[in-house]
UniProtKB/Swiss-Prot annotation:
pH dependence comment: Optimum pH is 9.0.
Matches recorded under Pfam families: HD, KH_1, RNase_Y_N
Protein name per its UniProtKB record: Ribonuclease Y
Disulfide bonds: none
Phenotype on disruption: No visible phenotype.
Predominant place of localization: membrane
Family: Belongs to the RNase Y family.
Amino acid sequence: MNLLSLLLILLGIILGVVGGYVVARNLLLQKQSQARQTAEDIVNQAHKEADNIKKEKLLEAKEENQILREQTEAELRERRSELQRQETRLLQKEENLERKSDLLDKKDEILEQKESKIEEKQQQVDAKESSVQTLIMKHEQELERISGLTQEEAINEQLQRVEEELSQDIAVLVKEKEKEAKEKVDKTAKELLATAVQRLAADHTSESTVSVVNLPNDEMKGRIIGREGRNIRTLETLTGIDLIIDDTPEAVILSGFDPIRREIARTALVNLVSDGRIHPGRIEDMVEKARKEVDDIIREAGEQATFEVNAHNMHPDLVKIVGRLNYRTSYGQNVLKHSIEVAHLASMLAAELGEDETLAKRAGLLHDVGKAIDHEVEGSHVEIGVELAKKYGENETVINAIHSHHGDVEPTSIISILVAAADALSAARPGARKETLENYIRRLERLETLSESYDGVEKAFAIQAGREIRVIVSPEEIDDLKSYRLARDIKNQIEDELQYPGHIKVTVVRETRAVEYAK
């Protein structure tokens, strides 16, 4: 029983598997058939769509072909019509040329006829002229016989009489025209100068050769002098400026003709007073610091001046030299202010005459630039200024304005003439300059230059208003014996070459320093 059940179950399973396989196969075959049918439908549909697209493209191609054909035919028709028009114009031109040719032929015939007539008339004129010349000669001979003069003598006499009659009239006319021209030129020049001067409002204060440093109290005077005068001697030696400490309450006077040195000394002394530490080593540091500060001030003054007159693209070194003019005076007149004033005047005159205002300003600012270093370099301030302008690539017009503003060379441009006129205007106005101060400063500069010309001299300072020249020498080159000889030589040369009131004390300073650093 159990075996039969197992067999039946096994048979049922086998039949179930076989039946399932048959059913699954039938389903698979049915799906494959459906898939083939679907694929065939898709292919058929694709063929139909392809046929439709092909037909559409063929239609579009035919339409485009038709459009191109129509356009080509239209262009051909247009070209044919254009060719016909050109052919018509050419035919018309040919006809015109033929007509003109006929006209020219006719004119040639007429001209030939006229030329023949002119030749006939010319022959008649020549015959008449010959007869006239014969008559004239007869008349001249008759006149010479009657007057007793030849033809040339008669002509010369007549010309001389006419010349005498006209010479006086011509002289009067020329004189009147010259007078009118001079009056017109003078009037125009006065109007130009008056206009320029009225447009410029410049103030001026005469430069001084002293500076005053205020002190917090009179005890500070003793600290400035130092033990046995060491501090004041160090400061005077380093700066070349006299320190005058007198009864003036809470003030020290700095005296010196070189404004740059005086400003360095003033700045150093102000810093020392503020710091409170005053001894030779500190003085040296402060003097060096003051030199740098004054250099910055000089550079800023140059930049401000160039900006004020619109002188752009100037070399930085030349700008700094322009700034040095702020510490230079000419007959008591500040040279930088004078240069700016000349620049403005030259610009105004140039504007009235239609010249380049910017170039006139630049030339006016630089016309006295040589004065900034004329006490350091040999030569006149004009020669030095020309060399500086060439060195720093200035315009030829600017160089000529510098060279010609004192008449050393001929001006080559209107700008140069205007700068010279502006320079004269600035210098000649009342109160602008003082002759005495300039002569005094030149005497001190000459005193220093003379002393520095000797070998072994490092620096020379004119102090005590020119009554003393202090000469700093190199201890390696000048010994104690040579220092006495040097003082005597300088004294002799001063007596031979300079004119001065009173006496001048010559002091030769020879200092040897031994410095070591403890580590």
